[in-house]
Amino acid sequence: MFFIEFNVKLARSLYLCLNLILSVLYSYITVKFISVYNFPIYFILLITTLIEIFIFLDTSYFRILTSIKTKYFYYILIVFSVVVFILKNNINLYYVLTFYFVYYLLISIVLLNYNLFVIEKSKSIKAGVTDISLYSNLSKLLGFSLGSYIYKVNIDEYLIVFIIVFVLFSSFKINNFKNETEKDSEKLVFNKLKRKYIIINTALLSGAAVFFIPLFIKQLAARNIIQYSSIIFFIPGLTVVLFLILTKKYDINLNRILMFYIIFDILFFILVICEVFLPLQVILLSLIVALGVSISIKLRTNFIKINDKDYRKSIVQIFRISAPVFTIILSFVGLYVENIAYYILLINAISAIHVLYVNLRNREHTLLD
């Protein structure tokens, strides 16, 4: 048993490790579903979003799983991993689905507790939200960068690593008490939330990368240079991480970020329509994604500050589901509307203009408060 004081630094490290596991797992499952079972890529997004919605409902109303101590989730994950390892010779669609569903559900609940702890115990709410976003994007960058090698690794090798990690984490003394972030939040009364439009804005500012990266990949395939596809994934992620590191050191005015976001969004729209130099499109998209994440951090920080602290756990989960839900809705719309990606750019610009308008109109109570 390791006796370690639970602090923000350790919580961030655990958050990074668990998020990295989910990112690697997401890459592995995506490759499996596309290459073996011929499922559309959005099917994985649908599964993860439904899980996140369940966690939100459980956090806000049911309290079935989210009231359980963190250490017990590690025990469950260890037992489940051992069972999955024993049954590894019977891999089929249901095996893979169950494997992903259980892992994503349990790890996401643990991440929610660590997420809330970092926000509560950091020197400021903004610092906590920025740290969470930085570590989340860093883990995705590392996890997705390994995506091209995922199919070469057997599932039992993953399971051995996972079991070792969960045993190690469960042995920490920090998980043997119920910290305050694991407590039940008050049942959410949605009408009591202030500035609910922030939820919509943060959702609308996301999604560009989800739709444009596949389009870029298609362009590479058409030019017979698909081997460079990993760069398309890597550059936006790296840009986000570097920009978040920059914003941790320097406080950049929200209105300036919004104006640059709107300008880049419109410029990117023109370049895409005119099919201008692909590398330039990738760079501009990366900047748009990075600025969008920065805007989202400021909006989420404001929303957490102005609303009841008893709802904080539910609020954190709201922001985990808002963007995926928006993406899924647009994905279904895209089945009937051609060039949906172009409309998303217009939606992004309109959302940013709305936030800028609200911020300029209410100078005494800006979204920076």
Residue ranges and their predicted role:
Residues 258-296:
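C-terminal transmembrane helical hairpin of 12-TM major facilitator-type secondary transporters
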Residues 16, 94-110, 280-296:
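Hydrophobic core of transmembrane alpha-helices in multi-pass small-molecule transporters
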Residues 109-122, 293-308:
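Intracellular juxtamembrane helix-capping segments at the cytosolic ends
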Residues 157-173, 342-357:
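Symmetry-related core transmembrane helices of the 12-TM Major Facilitator Superfamily/SLC fold
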Residues 2-52, 194-232:
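Helix-loop boundary and gating motifs at the non-cytosolic
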Residues 53-60, 231-250:
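Transmembrane alpha-helices of Major Facilitator/SLC transporters
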Residues 137-148, 323-332:
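Glycine/proline-centered helix-kink
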Residues 310-336:
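A late C-terminal transmembrane helix in Major Facilitator Superfamily
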